[in-house]
Amino acid sequence: MSDRVIIFDTTLRDGEQALAASLTVKEKLQIAQALERLGVDVMEVGFPVSSPGDFQSVQTIARHIKQSRVCALARALPKDIDAAGEALRVAEAFRIHTFISTSSIHVESKLKKSFEDVLEMGVSAIKHARRYTDDVEFSCEDAGRTPIDNLCRMVEAAIKAGARTINIPDTVGYTVPTEFSGIIQTLFNRVPNIDQAIISVHCHDDLGLSVANSIGAVQMGARQIECTINGIGERAGNCSLEEVAMILKTRADLLGVHTNIRHSEIHRTSALVSQLCNMPVQPNKAIVGANAFSHSSGIHQDGVLKAKNTYEIITPESIGLTQNNLNMTSRSGRHVIKHRMESMGYAESSYDLDDLYGKFLTLADKKGQVFDYDLEALAFFSQIHEEPEHFKLEYLGVQSGSSVMATASVKLKVGQEIVSEAATGNGPVDAVYQCINRITGYEISIDKYELKGKGEGKNALGQVDIVAQYKGRKFHGMGLATDIIESSAQALIHVINSIWRADQVAEQMERNVAKTDKINTESV
């Protein structure tokens, strides 16, 4: 038996079914090319018979993808298989994936046929698909709830008909790992021609067990896992590609198998799919969540600084990230504060660690997470505990519409002076940001803009979180208001004030250096 597990990605077929809005052909191609870079062996990219648009997207992807095998789905019907075959003809290498339900509830209630009819339809579909390609995959839909005797008969007949891959789906995410592994083990024990095909699994996450079921199946001999980026898919989603890929890599000592996945492309691919599908990744998502490599506990942070593998079983670099995050919160210890100051180039002799740590705890209790620029200001700018607002929003007005360019008028209090500015922009938020940037004179680029709703009804608030770049450094801002334009402005002003404090620190440091140089010169 091979020690390689084939990764069959179905983000563009099963994953896309979960989206509120369909992806464009261009967006699907972007994702397909990202999957190719990631190293997936097979990508299922659509259901050609379902619509002209799906046919076109499958054909376009098939024409452009060269390294991965392109697959399309078809019911066990000649018209479905013909549509898939025609759409895939232009591919370098392709697969037709045909399926039929095999569980009693599906056969009797959905198909309203006998199992013998279903068996015959499955065999006929495989033979029809082989007119287009030798690479035919057959799925026993709802295999997890199919009587085992019927499942064994179907698998044996499908292999005899010419299917190279037999897929065993837990379509409704019903089974538990021992149960699903037992199904796979039984197939290997009872199907006489099982060695003539690759056994695949396709698990859904309705009970949160899709990844565990897939790994259990591999331990029993399955050599293909069907999965999606970020686990997107019908209902609660599908088996997560990034999770199974990293499990098989990290626990190769136990599982003894490998994949062709380029793990350093995982984070990049996850982010692209999240963006194009408009499906944010939950922060605590394994492998690709924002908190996956973040440490907030002081004990954990201290351990990671001493040896990363104390609390990290995989490295952020292994999935394409540059480093882990030590979130500075009220739970962080002195060791973390000293480490962050050293990483910014400040020797311990240039500040009082005990004094800095006391100020840090006060600020952390007030605002939650503290950033590097906050730490600098705490060390070298005495008024930081008062959170001085050098820039303060006094007035905001916007005019926009579908046929007019957005215009904004903004008044800021800058120190003790009121400064006004007007500007146009690509939408009201951009117009407001143009005004603020003109008033402050800072050349800022926005890396991330995120809007969240807080509360319900007419009293609901819009929270805007942004990450901005200024002179190579990242600054975080947050605004909260009933008007999202105002909350957007407040978020940028939050950033502006942080930048101003950072500049004050830099100027103070320059004065300190100049003063020291003068004293040294006079001493000489």
Swiss-Prot record:
GO terms for cellular component: cytosol. GO terms for biological process: L-leucine biosynthetic process. Pathway: Amino-acid biosynthesis; L-leucine biosynthesis; L-leucine from 3-methyl-2-oxobutanoate: step 1/4. Residues 392-524 are annotated as: Regulatory domain. Keywords: Amino-acid biosynthesis, Branched-chain amino acid biosynthesis, Cytoplasm, Leucine biosynthesis, Manganese, Metal-binding, Transferase. One of its GO terms (molecular function) is acetyl-CoA C-acetyltransferase activity. Mn(2+) binds at residues 14, 202, 204, 238. Its EC number is 2.3.3.13. Belongs to the alpha-IPM synthase/homocitrate synthase family. LeuA type 1 subfamily. Homodimer. This is 2-isopropylmalate synthase. The lineage of its organism: Bacteria, Pseudomonadati, Pseudomonadota, Gammaproteobacteria, Aeromonadales.
